[in-house]
Amino acid sequence: MELPLGRCDDSRTWDDDSDPESETDPDAQAKAYVARVLSPPKSGLAFSRPSQLSTPAASPSASEPRAASRVSAVSEPGLLSLPPELLLEICSYLDARLVLHVLSRVCHALRDLVSDHVTWRLRALRRVRAPYPVVEEKNFDWPAACIALEQHLSRWAEDGRWVEYFCLAEGHVASVDSVLLLQGGSLCLSGSRDRNVNLWDLRQLGTESNQVLIKTLGTKRNSTHEGWVWSLAAQDHRVCSGSWDSTVKLWDMAADGQQFGEIKASSAVLCLSYLPDILVTGTYDKKVTIYDPRAGPALLKHQQLHSRPVLTLLADDRHIISGSEDHTLVVVDRRANSVLQRLQLDSYLLCMSYQEPQLWAGDNQGLLHVFANRNGCFQLIRSFDVGHSFPITGIQYSVGALYTTSTDKTIRVHVPTDPPRTICTRRHDNGLNRVCAEGNLVVAGSGDLSLEVWRLQA
């Protein structure tokens, strides 16, 4: 799929031009949505897989610059009398953290040797054996990237042989469609079609008490929401949940999960983004709405940016990015209060993960797409087939790791290279919805009424 570049001169003011939404049954609306949006391509209508775009990427080659020789000459025989190339070869067998944080403190000569960014670039490219990163960055932190890559490869070595797996099947009585890790992976929230948001203590996994489920948010007499819980987002110790009942509820984890606010949206809330100064919702009635969570929360602005439901969104201090069933990706400039770009796609995006300047997204055809933020404009640079045969429902990207989930009943673990290298695939009895990774925990929601958890080596 080749996606055209969006223009960066769409300066229309972000004013409300919404149409009123008629009253509908949220359960019937949700079921119709799932059947339409998350179902696999129909037989005989298979989508063509795109050839990768020709944007150049970094790759290990013969022309790669050699690490600078900075080891001072010594008169006495010993380790430092070895050639720099041999010292670097020895270092390649040591953990990257040890080399960077311990070996560099031994002496000035070793500090100079391991402080050269070319040293770390060569080491990273040898580890991944593919072009990396997918989007070139001028001031890329090669030591940090190398540490993250090596940790990821070590944790999932031998097809994830050393990874602990837990299936938390008691707590929900319907499909789990949203997950969120908190406090470095110590706690987890899960939202389900049973209308509840559950709080889990993942520190109790594998213990004798096994008291993993802490509580269900809300009052005991009622469920958390009156409709399916479809989205979760957090800002520090505060959490919000979005539902097909057209509400967003706010919860304070520092106060034992007590509710401290509620927003009545115009339609079913399908996606959320929570920042210190704004809370953004994407709804079934095609709107993107901004609230100030510090005041009320108070409605700031809203607009119908799309012609179909808003399926995924994210925000930072400069942009609000939304993807819709209408096959568009819209970028709003927060500071100029205007639409910056409107990209027309050949498929619709279901999930996104952003670490500037890379935006990774999964679509309804089972494909991954990478957009680069270049001087404020997002450009599609690569499209990948990573083996998913059905829609990609969850994605999480970081500089050293990439996770994807799909209704094809798999979670796939990748290295974020060009193309991504899949190092582990775990299959399940039902479709997987959303994925979240933090610390040494990875979680995914399952259509099998369970929360799936993988605990990695610390």
From Swiss-Prot:
Domain of life the protein comes from: Eukaryota
Keywords: Acetylation, Phosphoprotein, Repeat, Ubl conjugation pathway, WD repeat
Segments of this protein annotated with the region Disordered: 1-30, 42-64
Domain F-box: 76-123
Residues in WD repeats: 171-210, 220-261, 264-301, 305-342, 344-381, 387-424, 427-458
Biased composition (Acidic residues): 16-26
PROSITE patterns found in the cross-reference section: FBOX, WD_REPEATS_1, WD_REPEATS_2, WD_REPEATS_REGION
Location of Phosphothreonine modifications: 55
Phosphoserine PTM positions: 18, 59
Modified residues (N-acetylmethionine): 1
SMART domains, sorted: FBOX, WD40
GO cellular component, one term: cytosol
PANTHER family in the record: F-BOX_WD REPEAT-CONTAINING PROTEIN 9 (PTHR19855:SF34), WD40 REPEAT PROTEIN 12, 37 (PTHR19855)
Subunit structure: Interacts with SKP1 and CUL1.
Role summary: Substrate-recognition component of the SCF (SKP1-CUL1-F-box protein)-type E3 ubiquitin ligase complex.
Listed name of the protein: F-box/WD repeat-containing protein 9
Organism: Homo sapiens
